[in-house]
Structures are given as C-alpha cells and as structure tokens.
UniProtKB/Swiss-Prot annotation:
Pfam families: DHQ_synthase, DHQS_C. SUPFAM superfamilies: Dehydroquinate synthase-like. The gene is aroB. This is 3-dehydroquinate synthase. Catalyzes the conversion of 3-deoxy-D-arabino-heptulosonate 7-phosphate (DAHP) to dehydroquinate (DHQ). It comes from Protochlamydia amoebophila (strain UWE25). The lineage of its organism: Bacteria, Pseudomonadati, Chlamydiota, Chlamydiia, Parachlamydiales. Its EC number is 4.2.3.4. It catalyses: 7-phospho-2-dehydro-3-deoxy-D-arabino-heptonate = 3-dehydroquinate + phosphate. It is found in: Cytoplasm. Pathway: Metabolic intermediate biosynthesis; chorismate biosynthesis; chorismate from D-erythrose 4-phosphate and phosphoenolpyruvate: step 2/7. One of its GO terms (biological process) is chorismate biosynthetic process.
Amino acid sequence: MLNSSNYVIQSHCLDDLKYYLESLSYSKVVIITHPQLWVMYEQKITEQLFKLSWNFSVLLIPEGETSKSLKQTTRCWRHFIKHQLDRYSLVVALGGGVICDLAGFVASCYMRGIDTIYLPTTLLAMVDASIGGKTGINTSKSKNIIGSFHLPKKILIDPFTLKTLSKKHYQAGFAEIIKYGMIASPSLFEFLENSWSLIEQRDEGLLEIIIQQSCAIKKKYVEADFKDLGIRAQLNYGHTFGHVIEMMSRYQYLHGEAVSIGMSCAAYLSCQMGLTTQETMQRQDALCQQAQLPIHLPHFPLTRFTYLMAKDKKGRNGSINLILPEKVGKVTQIFDVDPHLIKNTLSTKMTK
C-alpha cells in the first residue's frame, strides 16, 4: 500500500530523480506525457534518467480528457510492443490526471501488469489522480468506465512544478482539496478558508502542508477499502454529478470545475432532504467561490442528465446512489435517491 517509501512530497524532488529512484532497475522505460510538458521537462528528466543509465523512449499524448480513450490506449500498447517492453519494464507518467489515469491503465494491462512511476505536474493529480491506484479510460457514454486498480511503484510530488501551472488548472485542483475537508477534515476546510491569500501566491511551504494533509486523508480511505466497495465511496463526493457535467459539456469543464458544481448540487440536495443545514451548504459554496470555482450548472436536459447519473458505476440496477454532506467533515451515502428530487436540484442550480 501507500507508505513514505513510495510517495514523496518535496519541492524540487524532480531535480534529483537519481536519489529517489537509484534503488530501482528496469530493462526499458517509456515516458508518457503531453507535448507541451515534454518541452518544459525534457532536459531535466533526460539528464536524470541518463544518470540512472535507464534506456527510455517517449510517447507524446494529446492534451485533454478525450485522450483517455481506446484510441490512445492502443497507441500506447503499440509503442510498448515496438520498443519491446517486457515484464521488467517501467512506464513513467509525467503530467496531470489524464496522463496518470491513461498510463496507469495501459501499464496495468500490458503483460498483466508492469511497474509505473508517477511524476504529477498538476495540483489535482498530486492530491487525487496519482494517489490510490485507480486507473481508467472513458467511452462516449461513461467516464472511467474501463479501468483497473494498479498501485504505482513510486510517486514523486514536486510542489515547485505548480509555479508554472495555469491559474485555471491550479484553481481546479482545489476542488478535490475542498472535498477532502468536506468529507473528513473540518480543520483542513477551516485552514483553506483562512489561508487563501497565501494559497493564491502559491507559497511552496503552504502547498506542501496542504498536499500532505490531502494525501494523508486519501491514504486512509485507500488502505481501508482499496477496491472501492465500501467507505472509499465517500471520495466520490460531488463526482456523480460532476462526471455527467463533464460528459454533457464534452469536457469543456475541467474535472475540478465539474466536481465543484457537483459538490454544490449535492449540498443543495442534502439541504432539501434535511440532512444538512443551509450554513454548511453556504460555507462550502463560499469556499468554492473563493477559489474561483463554479457552483452553477449550464442548461442541460434534465432527463438525459439523470439517465446518465443512473449509469454511474457506483449505482446498482439503475438506482442513483449519492454521497451527501451532513456537516463540514462528515458525509453519508444515500441509496436510490428520488430522481425528481435530483431534477429539482439541477433546475435550481442551473445558471439563471
């Protein structure tokens, strides 16, 4: 499972890959990343891998959620076969959530599983996609519907890389961090409420603390329920709404933006069902807005929206099961939620 030996959170750790990876040995290595990222990191990564005497190739994947596809999956496997990767080879994922999900999935299937190392470069990947062993790709009908559980050998999280992350992607990463506060940590939630000026400045020391706390929360869930059959479902707070928002908008919303809207919908619904208070709902919405994250939906057909929610992999026999908040730091799972209540929530939350 996750422990201090296989994930590192340290500014500038990507400057010294040899120190963290020299105990490992691989026959061949493939780096999967985006073209723009490779321009930024090619010299640094190449120098480090030469020091390790690793024989590597690079596979460039287009940016965007649409790259989590069977087309790109097949490209990866063809590359592996062309470069004669064997069971003692390694896949390095350099990038955000899309790269981690895709690289992890193709590695988990190739020769029934080869090792991965994650070098996440977005905040969302640092606190979510790289942690926990979930991998997955999308189809035209569902998000992350094809996937596996495959823990990386190593995760190197370098908060310094966030200095060059776009404002939009930086803000989107905080949706998952706010989620951790809502499901498990009132202290983290309050810390975010009171520290926003430093967060906006991307203070490295502060970010290390926030990332450490976020990863520690996810680690507890993963260790308690690795295969996502019980309490780990709480990590999906905001995601059942959010995944549909992503799909129906054709991924015009970043994952974190969609999760922010999803959490707002979930809190409103919870309030209508008498499970939480308006104060809890308003605190969450205020923090998301402080992070400049959206909390309102665009106009989507309601019947289509609830139909897609019922197809979510957490559902059963067409029912819609949701994680809903009771208070900051505590959520509960509600099974077979009335679609009419959901439609009312969606209608209320749509942009006027």
